């Protein structure tokens, strides 16, 4: 029989606390709203987020008022990668993507109650660029101690989207990444006397 280490004790109590919290979640209104979201709404919300971070010539970028001639995050396939990454990060019911979409859309509706109906079913995807920035500002400014995970999510979600977008061939083309530096003429002989 193995000894109970401090680390394994903390892991087990953390899982127990999380299980207790998850058991109570179905009674929370935002969870009911999140689980009732259609997959299209999740996809639209994540696409609105992708266009916010890496705009392109797509419909989501046009709706927010920030476009580029070069292909953006939508063309790079970042929406699917983001949904897959979030849902694999913490396998849960509802999926993390659904929860993120509910939080972004809920904050968007608080910001502009008349935003839906719009071009998209997703309130967040219908926002202008500056309003999307305000959604993230509000989420990061929540001062409630219990909202630490929400602040963490809002603070790290843009970086995750950028990473996923620029880790693709389209992203490398956008950033003018020319490949690894090994073997370039300016480095040949640099480390030799």
Range-by-range predicted roles:
Residues 31-33:
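Boundary at the C-terminal end of the N-terminal hydrophobic targeting segment
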């Amino acid at each position: 029989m193995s000894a109970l280490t401090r680390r394994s004790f903390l892991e087990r109590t953390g899982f127990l606390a999380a299980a207790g919290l998850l058991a109570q979640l179905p009674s929370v209104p935002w969870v009911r709203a999140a689980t009732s979201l259609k997959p299209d709404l999740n996809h639209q919300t994540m696409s609105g987020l992708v266009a916010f971070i890496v705009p392109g010539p797509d419909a989501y970028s046009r709706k927010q008022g920030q476009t580029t001639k070069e292909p953006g995050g939508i063309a790079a396939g970042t929406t699917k990668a983001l949904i897959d990454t979030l849902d694999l990060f913490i396998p849960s019911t509802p999926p993390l993507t659904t929860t993120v979409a509910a939080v972004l859309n809920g904050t968007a509706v608080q910001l502009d109650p008349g935003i839906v109906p719009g071009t998209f079913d997703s309130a967040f995807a219908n926002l202008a660029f500056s309003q999307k920035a305000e959604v993230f500002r509000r989420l990061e400014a929540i001062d409630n101690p219990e909202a630490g995970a929400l602040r963490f999510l809002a603070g790290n979600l843009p970086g995750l989207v950028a990473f996923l977008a620029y880790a693709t061939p389209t992203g490398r083309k956008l950033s003018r990444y020319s490949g690894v530096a090994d073997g370039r003429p300016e480095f040949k002989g640099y480390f030799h006397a």
